[in-house]
Amino acid sequence: MAKLLSFSDESRGALEKGVNNLANALKVTIGPKGRNVVIEKKFGAPDIVNDGVTIAKEIDLEDPFENIGAKLIEQVASKTKEKAGDGTTTATVLAQFMVQEGLRNTAAGASPIELRRGMEKAVAQIVDDLKKKSKSVSGDAIKQVATVSAGGDEEIGSMIADAIDKVSFDGVITVEESKSLATELDITEGMAFDRGYSSPYFVTDEDRLICEFENPSILITDKKISSIADLIPVLETVQKNGTPLIILAEEVEGEALATLVVNKNRGVLQVAAVRAPSFGERRKAALGDIAVLTGGTLISEDKAMSLEKVQISDLGQARRVTITKDSTTIVANEAQNTELSNRIASIKRELEETDSEYDQEKLNERIAKLAGGVAVIKVGAPTETELKNRKLRIEDALNATRAAIEEGIVAGGGTTLLELSEGLGDLAKKLEGDQKTGVEIIKRALTAPTKQIAINAGFNGDVVVSDIKRLGKGFNAQTGEYEDLLEAGILDASKVIRLALQDAVSIASLLITTEVVIADKPEPPSAPGAEGGDPMGGMGGMGGMGGMGGMGGMGMPGMM
């Protein structure tokens, strides 16, 4: 494919336009009085969302160079979301300011390399100062962090605090859509472990990069599966029943994995493969725990059991299974209480008999996973559009709460960044030239989130920042009052603030040191009637896998 090249100020100018287009769409959502963004969908009703990363993923700009700038800022939002679960809009607002100021100074003759060094030194100091300022989470702080992250919704804050209280900080909390209008908290049997899908092609929700099935069957085995022939009987059974299948095995690889992926993508099967947790004998124990939890049978080599002879009664059942790239959560049905109690009692007897501290730790972990249960927040709303928006808010609030538990809390509303910016004056005095300018860029950038929160609430951002410095108090955008935000319960998770700042400066420093941009040359519009050719042609490439196992000849006419 032919490429387009852009150089120097022209290239940086195009990148900046892309950054501004995306950032301007995102920053209207920040703060308790942030606005919504309406996103048109090809099919169905439009989405109305308040979630930064969801908005960012929907934006594609016509100009290829501007689109690269937009995608770099989308990367800021996505990285912050992935690592902290919240703070995407804060990261975007910071990155936009840093890019604008950095490019303005570069155009005036500043060295982009020296600017970057100064910016990185400033951020390193802010991160150190942030750690010193953080306070551990206690009392009502959990509810307050969740409430702030949910856009001031106290019902959500209370529900998340209640969920953590019931399943502990280390417990599993999931969010699902309710069939009623009410949002409810349900505690049920379940388990989570740190293994994800065997292939990203099993993803069913591309926005969240997860694979999620309702009421799936679960094949549980300690075997390594490489031949599709081993799976044909069970695949035929679940295909006839229309039931999703989760294959939990030591490894699914080669021909078996490729065939499952192709049939899943063609819509023939609802299937996903997951690597079994732990190693060696502990893996068998963990799989045994999952078998008891789901009412299934562990198909084990030790018992001389064969995958070809698996019956539907050997498969485990779950209410819901959610799989990410590195974790799996099983929400169990409620029919296994007796077997579960017996399993826990058996593990406790093992615990009493062992003297090894390591074994005791692992056995206690197994008990906690089986006994702790899963807190399920069932989200209800009058319309599907509101339901999606509310679900995103709850997920953000839950992620922010977990981040607060990890690294502590600070005053919210952008106030902490504003306070920490004052400490950069001493650092700037120690530096000179463009490095000093880089520090000053970060100092000014740290005021940007507070300004935008104030603007979204209908106030003058510059006046609010000036008043905060003069009064020594934070700005409560919900009430329009100046007060101690820690006492008022307006809190941010330190981890969210730290990652937003680090991710923002990472992308901004790359952008201001860019000299050449290379983009794909847009293809001319297709002739009328030819539009369907390319997509179908691309699918045809998968047909080459049809010889992989010859499933049609093995009793699976509907597959491959």
UniProtKB/Swiss-Prot annotation:
* GO MF annotation list: ATP binding; ATP-dependent protein folding chaperone; isomerase activity; unfolded protein binding
As for family, the record states: Belongs to the chaperonin (HSP60) family.
EC number from the UniProt entry = 5.6.1.7
- The UniProt annotation puts the region (Disordered) at 520-542
List all membrane-crossing ranges. none
Function, as annotated, reads:
Together with its co-chaperonin GroES, plays an essential role in assisting protein folding. The GroEL-GroES system forms a nano-cage that allows encapsulation of the non-native substrate proteins and provides a physical environment optimized to promote and accelerate protein folding.
Compartments in which it is found: Cytoplasm
Signal peptide (from-to): none
The annotated subunit structure for this chain is: Forms a cylinder of 14 subunits composed of two heptameric rings stacked back-to-back. Interacts with the co-chaperonin GroES.
Key words, A-Z: ATP-binding, Chaperone, Cytoplasm, Isomerase, Nucleotide-binding
UniProt cross-references to Pfam families, sorted A to Z: Cpn60_TCP1
The cellular component terms of Gene Ontology attached to this UniProt record, alphabetical and capped at eight, are: cytoplasm
Tell me what reaction this enzyme catalyses.
ATP + H2O + a folded polypeptide = ADP + phosphate + an unfolded polypeptide
The protein here is known as Chaperonin GroEL 2
Q: Which InterPro entries has this protein been placed in?
A: Chaperonin_Cpn60_CS, Cpn60/GroEL, Cpn60/GroEL/TCP-1, GroEL-like_apical_dom_sf, GROEL-like_equatorial_sf, TCP-1-like_intermed_sf
Gly residues bias spans: 530-542
* Superkingdom field: Bacteria
Q: Which gene produces this protein? A: groEL2
Alphabetical list of NCBIfam families matching this protein: GroEL, PRK00013.1, PRK12849.1, PRK12850.1, PRK12851.1
Protein residues bound to ATP: T29, I30, G31, P32, D86, G87, T88, T89, T90, G413, D492
Q: Does the keyword Cell membrane apply?
A: no
Q: Name one GO biological process term.
A: protein refolding
Mainly resides where?
cytoplasm
